[in-house]
UniProtKB/Swiss-Prot annotation:
Actins are highly conserved proteins that are involved in various types of cell motility and are ubiquitously expressed in all eukaryotic cells. It catalyses: ATP + H2O = ADP + phosphate + H(+). This is Actin, cytoplasmic 2. One of its GO terms (cellular component) is cytoskeleton. The modification Tele-methylhistidine is found at residue 73. The gene is actg1. It is found in: Cytoplasm, Cytoskeleton. PANTHER family: ACTIN (PTHR11937).
Amino acid sequence: MDEEIAALVVDNGSGMCKAGFAGDDAPRAVFPSIVGRPRHQGVMVGMGQKDSYVGDEAQSKRGILTLKYPIEHGIVTNWDDMEKIWHHTFYNELRVAPEEHPVLLTEAPLNPKANREKMTQIMFETFNTPAMYVAIQAVLSLYASGRTTGIVMDSGDGVTHTVPIYEGYALPHAILRLDLAGRDLTDYLMKILTERGYSFTTTAEREIVRDIKEKLCYVALDFEQEMATAASSSSLEKSYELPDGQVITIGNERFRCPEALFQPSFLGMESCGIHETTFNSIMKCDVDIRKDLYANTVLSGGTTMYPGIADRMQKEITALAPSTMKIKIIAPPERKYSVWIGGSILASLSTFQQMWISKQEYDESGPSIVHRKCF
């Protein structure tokens, strides 16, 4: 496909929006899924102040803005802001006219049906796209890893899910969803840093904590042992410089924060950890295909980027699975973007071209067409 009519691939995450052209090997635009509105009255006349800012611009002016994320737990909760993000994606980031390109969007599995209908409606009615499609995120990650069978543990900023896929088909009865992901870990880190005497409260300060989390946190192979090490020596301590020059020290918080993925009780949640959720998902599948799932456990999404997470998953799942089972955790280095990469692969396949929902089909059937054409 030439640049002229290349499909646009937009992976709208709860935390980051990844967008680009089908056939590319990486997204052209990656920006925070944030809409910011001024907290104060504008007094400077003629400054061209806007009533809202999107993405990086909102991030850089965060000190004077209230930041809102229109996507929570993978579900769009604020459609007006979502439209702003899409508008920004097409016109400011990719600089394309959406009415000239087919658009591939992504969504979390087990999302409410109304959510994808509304996505479809906005694409056709507001942006006048000639064609569109909604794909499930985890399935795209598996495409990106070059497999058709495996179980994907996809964890982003807003939602984590485990999706078993066999010969290219997602097994809906075995998909499990966990509303515990990056944003919850950021909030938890804010809380445990407060216990150390560092107070982070505003929406802007939360972004600083997110940066600390991304730069310094890791998953311990053995949590209890790591806690003992942290208590007896300062070898695990790291320092971080805040935007105002103040330096803070962070110790056991570095691994206590992501430990909540394995022990959600840290957050006061009753759910199972990501290792148990993955195991339960496999156990809901037919006994004959479990072996293939254990041997192809693929990690995807930004919240799987912690150092040590693959080894820990290997250890935890080995403890749960039958003792003779071969277990392999696949953690591709580009897993932060694997959903997008999978979308880029899918949208450029010649066999996929008949799968698009066209404007004509939409006009005939309305938004519900999305349930028939996208599965």
